[in-house]
């Protein structure tokens, strides 16, 4: 087990290093400059490039960035908040992005499990077809479309919740963004729960339990549902990270000061350091969660660990 965990950690670190290198190359190829909007002469721009080390070869900048990153230094902002440490900017905004993601995950998990269980227990009925149709629609509709519909009908027409984020009422301001983000995970969890629960209900040991005269609700709650939810739980980690990493447009729509909106501002203003740092933080969160899921899979099912170690 220790060998398996060590190998997964090394692979994750190598993946992060490759991602960081790709981000550097992409930022280097991007047109424009963080100093384009300023009324500066070419000589002044050259001085700024030299000040921030942007005149150095990409390899030198990459190695210096990695060295500084190991000490927690992600550089400073060039355009959004000049000379302000990016690590501080991210730490101020990361919490609200995580909160929105967790709220969306809670909503998606509750309604996804309900839809999936109801669908599986009424397999091949009109209820199953209705739940499946709702799941397909949920997967198909982008979160930003849901956000715009919620803004118009719930916030503008019914005036139940504010459209834009308000620090005085943070919780109510995050309800609509969380609901918009929860549509896709609701559908995915519902489909996954339905599939797993149907497989479990058709398994031999469930048929054996039924033959012993165990009541249906006890059989479902104590045996079928418990076994069906093990694979579902393992996919919730990546779904949560996807919610946080995919909330950039939602944060812009609702004016939420999260890391997603910060990354979009960095792209719009050619703030290389901000864009790289935000993208890297998202990547690190996703890979860390996938690492945890891999380890959990290895603990839950040793066959997975053995097969990966053999490779």
Where are the regions a protein language model picked out?
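Membrane-water interface segments at the C-terminal ends of transmembrane alpha-helices
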Residues: 23-29, 65-67, 133-162, 180-185
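Membrane-embedded alpha-helical segments of multi-pass transporters/permeases
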Residues: 16, 20, 24-29, 144, ...
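Alpha-helical transmembrane segments of integral membrane proteins
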Residues: 2-3, 90-127, 143, 168-311
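N-terminal signal-anchor/signal peptide hydrophobic helix marking the start
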Residues: 6-15
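Hydrophobic alpha-helical transmembrane segments of membrane transport/permease proteins
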Residues: 16-63, 79, 158-174
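An internal, D/E-rich "acidic patch" concept
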Residues: 55-113
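Hydrophobic alpha-helical segments of integral membrane proteins
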Residues: 9, 44, 48, 58-74, ...
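Hydrophobic aliphatic residues
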Residues: 26, 30, 38, 70, ...
């Amino acid at each position: 087990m220790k060998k398996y965990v060590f190998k997964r950690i090394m692979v994750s670190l190598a993946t992060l290093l490759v991602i960081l290198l790709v981000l550097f190359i992409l930022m280097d190829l991007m047109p424009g400059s963080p100093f384009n909007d300023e009324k500066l002469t070419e000589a002044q721009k050259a001085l700024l490039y030299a000040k921030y080390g942007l005149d150095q070869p990409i390899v030198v900048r990459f190695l210096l960035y990695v060295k500084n990153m190991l000490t927690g230094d992600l550089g400073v902002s060039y355009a959004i908040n000049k000379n302000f440490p990016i690590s501080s900017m991210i730490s101020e905004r990361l919490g609200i992005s995580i909160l929105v993601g967790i709220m969306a995950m809670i909503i998606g998990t509750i309604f996804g499990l309900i839809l999936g269980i109801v669908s599986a227990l009424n397999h091949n009925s009109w209820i199953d077809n209705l739940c499946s149709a709702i799941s397909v629609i949920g997967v198909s509709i982008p979160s930003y479309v849901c956000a715009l519909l919620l803004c118009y009908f719930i916030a503008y027409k019914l005036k139940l919740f504010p459209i834009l984020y308000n620090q005085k009422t943070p919780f109510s301001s995050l309800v609509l963004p969380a609901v918009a983000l929860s549509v896709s995970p609701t559908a995915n969890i519902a489909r996954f729960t339905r599939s797993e629960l149907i497989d479990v209900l058709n398994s031999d040991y469930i048929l054996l339990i039924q033959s012993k005269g165990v009541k249906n609700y006890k059989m479902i709650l104590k045996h079928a549902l418990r076994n069906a939810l093990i694979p579902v739980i393992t996919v919730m980690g990546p779904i949560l990270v996807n919610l946080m990493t995919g909330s950039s447009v939602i944060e812009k729509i609702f004016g939420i000061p999260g890391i997603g909106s910060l990354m979009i501002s960095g792209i719009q203003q050619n703030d290389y350091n901000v864009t790289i740092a935000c993208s890297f933080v998202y990547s690190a969160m996703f890979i860390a969660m996938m690492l945890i899921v891999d380890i959990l899979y290895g603990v839950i099912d040793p066959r997975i660990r053995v097969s990966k170690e053999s490779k």
